[in-house]
Amino acid sequence: MHQYKELKIWQKAMELVTNIYQVTKGFPNVERFGLVSQINRCAVSIPSNIAEGAGRNSEKEFVRFLAISHASSFELETQLIISRNINYLSNDTLNEFTEQIAELQKMNFALQSRLISSYSNKIQSVKNIEN
């Protein structure tokens, strides 16, 4: 089990959620139950899945939740592009979010790679012991 609050990726994802909520407050009220709700839920999903995965008992399970978090980041980016296309976001704001999301995606991929490597090494060690 990992201490998720100490993970830099979780901390950065939490910053993203705060920034997303601040920006979506300015969206039209007609979007409250539509795009705003979808964007906010998607943003919340990113650190939530990191935390849930960190609380699991194995690297393999953690990787599965990181993959869900990773997919949510692409979904969020798509929703933000839609928001820009319908003039709810400026290009500058979209670019700032895109940079934040890209950083999270890189961190997520790196963490998944480390966990997979660790998991694979443990499996190999067990096989070596059995032989």
Where do the model's predicted regions map?
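Short, C-terminally biased terminal segments at protein or domain edges
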Residues: 1-131
